[in-house]
Amino acid sequence: MTFCKRRLSARCLLVAATLVVAFYVRLAWSATVEDVAMMKSPDRQKVLIEGAKKEGKVMFYTGLIVDQVVRPLKEGFEKEYPFVQVDFFRGNSENIARRVLTEYQAKRYEVDVVSGSAATSMVQRAGFMQRFYSPHLAEYPPELKDSKGFWGSTNVYFMTLGYNTRNVKANELPRTYEDLLQPRWKGQMMWSTSRGSGAPQFIGNILLTMGPEAGKAYLQKLKAQNIAKSTASARQILDLVIAGEYPLAIQIFNHHAYISKTAGAPVDWQPLEPVTATINTIGLAKHAPRPHAAMLFLDFLLSKKGQKIVQVSNYLPSHPEIPALQADLKPGGGRFKKANYISPDVLYDQGNDWVDYFQNQFLK
């Protein structure tokens, strides 16, 4: 060591560098999942990288469409961090939550990052999510991140009307919720019975924004409009409208209508404000077996670089500074201003009530 003080030889520098790397590796492997998740130190990135190199992969449970956005995100992340492989499982929120709960009850810890519109809250309520810190979360508004730190958001969904442009004239379009009660639309509308993207969420938005008394009074009037019901997804409902089976669909994803319109289909979307908005959330599993790689992945998804991949995949990025490819698909883009973001916690707490109301009032 005295020799190193006298002369900074190449050998001494190599020894010092080796000791530094060994320190970070030892630190990484002695840390708990919570330690890694909540790390805020100046050397955070270095610690995450050294730990992730040892872990080698990250397991991602998601409801996002694989070919449209999951693979591009995987490729973008692996290009940034070639020493980490992204593996994934795709399912809806219920399937993801069920899979995590089954694994955790068996003390089999496979998942690192959980994603979905309601999956994170469902898993969190079971006690199996970990609070985490990401420097990128500071760039997001309060409605797009959890105040307790359990989730952030990759993308948002806006539910609007979808209509067949051959069957509905521009001057006939409903422009308010009250317009749906016009005689013109009786028996001419369709919606999905899906809990996640159909009539129950529409009902929830009405009750949350109008209040229980006024909301239920409105819904009773809407019930008299004899809306056609289908167990099909919102995307499939839109396809039925494109085919001309019904002129108007309630509660479809506006970006789906945009994609079909640009492909030449006779369809467009119309917002009713406040627009129903839901959030695709992401978070860290409580016993994530690869927490360093998981935190790098979460950082990447929340970063502007990751959000731009979401953008070019024709999803609607959550980051307020990353617009949709078609800017008017998001609030403030020209077609609507007001959106009611239904948080996953509200969806978890009140979703069953909305389903019950729909089944009791609209299905009987």
Enumerate the language-model features and the residues they cover:
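Extracytoplasmic ligand-binding site segments that recognize negatively charged/polar headgroups
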Residues: 59-74, 86-104, 108-245
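Short amphipathic alpha-helical coupling segments at ligand-binding clamshell hinges
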Residues: 73, 214-218, 289-301, 309-312
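A bilobed periplasmic-binding-protein/Venus flytrap-type ligand-binding module shared by bacterial periplasmic
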Residues: 160-167, 204-208, 279-290, 309-310
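A ligand-binding cleft/hinge motif common to bilobed small-molecule-binding domains
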Residues: 120-123, 247-266
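Periplasmic-binding protein-like
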Residues: 142, 156-159, 185-195, 218-223, 228-231, 301-324, ...
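Extracytoplasmic "Venus flytrap"
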Residues: 33-45, 53-72, 197, 280
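Extracellular/periplasmic bilobal clamshell ligand-binding domains
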Residues: 327-364
